[in-house]
Amino acid sequence: MENLTEDMKTWFEIYMLQNRYIGHLDNDRLERWPEMFTEDCTYEIVPKENADLGLPVGIVHCTNQRMLRDRVVSLRHANIYEEHTYRHMTSGLAIVAQRDGEIDTESNYVVVQTRSNGESNVYQAGKYYDTVVRTPDGLRYKAKRVIYDTSRVQTLLATPI
């Protein structure tokens, strides 16, 4: 029973990490988004078609927290895109492996995008494949691989998924 309790506690901690992650994105706290990752993290967004074919090419590929911060600065000051908000829905969070202090998880996501005209659409759906580690500051993403099912990205992918 002790292992079950420990497994449930770990799952809940990861669930809360994911909720903080999407909370930062959905509530325009983008400057806090990189804090969810380790310094040596990997963050990538890849179409399912490429992932299924073993092709590593994605539409976003960041290899450390500095690149994530640069992405936010670019969004705030350099990129031009239509104002929008995201609302993430996640489900099916599962711990699939634990080894050497790393926890691998999978979950499903759907992002609804609302544009400045008030129109809302399903923007993207897919899966998160995450590697989570414990740090002195709590759980952090060491790797987040976003595999989107949607056949094409309808507008500029400005805000992280």
Curated annotation (Swiss-Prot):
Which key words are in the record?
A: Aromatic hydrocarbons catabolism, Dioxygenase, NAD, Oxidoreductase
Q: State the Gene Ontology BP annotations.
A: catabolic process
**EC number(s)?**
1.14.12.1
Q: How does it assemble?
A: Part of a multicomponent enzyme system composed of a reductase (AndAa), a ferredoxin (AndAb) and a two-subunit oxygenase component (AndAc and AndAd).
Tell me the function of this protein: Oxygenase component of anthranilate dioxygenase multicomponent enzyme system which catalyzes the incorporation of both atoms of molecular oxygen into anthranilate to form catechol. Can also act on benzoate and salicylate but not on 2-chlorobenzoate or o-toluate.
Q: Per its UniProt record, what SUPFAM superfamilies does this chain match?
A: NTF2-like
State the NCBIfam families in the record.
ant_diox_AndAd
Catalytic activity as recorded in UniProt: anthranilate + NADH + O2 + 3 H(+) = catechol + NH4(+) + CO2 + NAD(+); anthranilate + NADPH + O2 + 3 H(+) = catechol + NH4(+) + CO2 + NADP(+)
Asked if the Swiss-Prot or TrEMBL record annotates the protein with the keyword Zinc-finger, the reply is no
Do you know which CDD domains this protein is assigned to?
ring_hydroxylating_dioxygenases_beta
Write the protein's name.
Answer: Anthranilate 1,2-dioxygenase small subunit
Q: A Gene Ontology molecular-function term?
A: anthranilate 1,2-dioxygenase (deaminating, decarboxylating) activity
Question: Which organism does this sequence originate in?
Answer: Burkholderia cepacia
**Pathway participation:** Aromatic compound metabolism; anthranilate degradation via hydroxylation; catechol from anthranilate: step 1/1
Instruction: Please report which protein family the annotation says this sequence is part of.
Output: Belongs to the bacterial ring-hydroxylating dioxygenase beta subunit family.
The answer, when asked if Oxidoreductase is one of the entry's keywords, is yes
- Induction text: By anthranilate but not by benzoate or salicylate. Expression is positively regulated by the transcriptional regulator AndR.
List the InterPro entries.
Answer: Anthranilate_1-2-diOase_ssu, NTF2-like_dom_sf, Rng_hydr_dOase-bsu, SnoaL-like
- Pfam families annotated for this entry? SnoaL_4 (PF13577)
